[in-house]
């Protein structure tokens, strides 16, 4: 299995699907391995066979080592940059969801030349500009590691990631994802290491320094990272497009299986055209 090693000795695992000339990096959220993406790489390749999809496991998840010490979101962004080095990729389109969106922001700020285009899903700039989740959602999130192996984990996860109307369909919507996290859950210490990094995350006014074409996606029913966070990001990243998905919660790719493929296709078209569009809201 391929790995890169960070300066602190942490080994970061990654995998690659496709052998095309257009690299796309998928970065997942808190406590999740790259297996979280399930059939998203297949859908991307079905849409565009010229893609090369890179899937890093964030430190502490999947086959990556748990970090030897506490770290920041920017540390994980540097990990992704090292993966790009190992893959001989100069620059890629980067898709990040939730914490993965925070990593993607830091990657675009710290390694500008490595990011050709950006898709930020269900994510936040952090305090003081971002909006906090409701306390009920935060409490549900913090009890997640202790619930994952239990039978009621499906409804526990659904209450956090899906609109209430979709709770009865949780197993159908997640389609194998719950089984995955029940059989190979993240270690609680690794989960809270990542959570500490998320709590310290902020990009603030620096977000205006992101210069690559950017699409920002949110669900209007996201109970974990309120849509106002995405609105703020889209208003301050030059030329960013905001996509608001009706009836969708935090688990955007689970509720809309093709949203990543659609958005990456639009992003590649924008970069290929070489034009910067004015911000607009797309329903």
Question: Model features per residue range: what roles?
Answer:
Residues 6-66:
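Conserved HGGG/HGGXW glycine-rich cap/lid loop of the alpha/beta-hydrolase fold
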Residues 54-95, 262:
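Active-site loop/oxyanion-hole signature of alpha/beta-hydrolase fold enzymes
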Residues 96, 100, 104:
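Gly/Ala-rich beta-loop-alpha elbow adjacent to hydrolase catalytic centers
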Residues 109, 116-147:
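Flexible "cap/lid" loop of the alpha/beta hydrolase fold
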Residues 151-197, 204-206:
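Conserved alpha/beta-hydrolase catalytic His-Asp/Glu region
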Residues 210, 216-218, 222:
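Short beta-strand/loop motif that positions the catalytic acidic residue
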Residues 223-229:
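Conserved alpha/beta-hydrolase "acid-adjacent" motif
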Residues 240-283:
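Catalytic active-site module of serine/aspartate enzymes centered on a nucleophile-bearing elbow/loop
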């Amino acid at each position: 299995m391929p790995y890169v090693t960070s300066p602190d000795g942490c080994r970061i695992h990654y995998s690659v699907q496709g052998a095309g000339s257009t690299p796309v990096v998928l970065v997942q959220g808190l406590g999740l391995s790259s297996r979280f993406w399930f059939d998203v790489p297949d859908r991307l390749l079905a849409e565009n066979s010229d893609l090369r999809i890179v899937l890093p496991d964030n430190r502490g998840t999947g086959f990556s080592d748990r970090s030897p010490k506490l770290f920041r979101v920017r540390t994980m962004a540097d990990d992704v940059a090292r993966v790009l080095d190992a893959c001989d990729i100069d620059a890629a389109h980067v898709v990040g969801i939730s914490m993965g969106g925070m990593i993607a922001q830091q990657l675009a700020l710290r390694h500008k030349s490595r990011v050709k285009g950006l898709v930020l899903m269900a994510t936040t700039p952090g305090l003081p500009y971002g909006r906090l989740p409701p306390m009920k959602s935060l409490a549900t999130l913090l009890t997640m590691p202790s619930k994952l192996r239990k039978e009621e984990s499906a409804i526990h996860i659904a209450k956090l990631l899906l609109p209430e109307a979709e709770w009865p369909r949780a197993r159908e919507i997640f389609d194998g994802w719950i089984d995955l996290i029940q059989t190979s859950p993240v270690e609680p210490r690794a989960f809270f290491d990542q959570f500490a990094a998320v709590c310290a995350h902020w990009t603030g006014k620096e977000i205006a320094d992101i210069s690559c074409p950017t699409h920002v996606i949110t669900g209007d029913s996201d109970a974990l990272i309120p849509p106002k966070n995405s609105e703020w990001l889209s208003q301050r990243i030059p030329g960013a497009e905001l996509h608001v998905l009706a009836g969708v919660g935090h688990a955007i790719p689970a509720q809309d299986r093709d949203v990543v493929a659609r958005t990456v296709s639009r992003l590649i078209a924008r970069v290929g055209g070489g034009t910067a569009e004015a911000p607009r809201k797309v329903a």
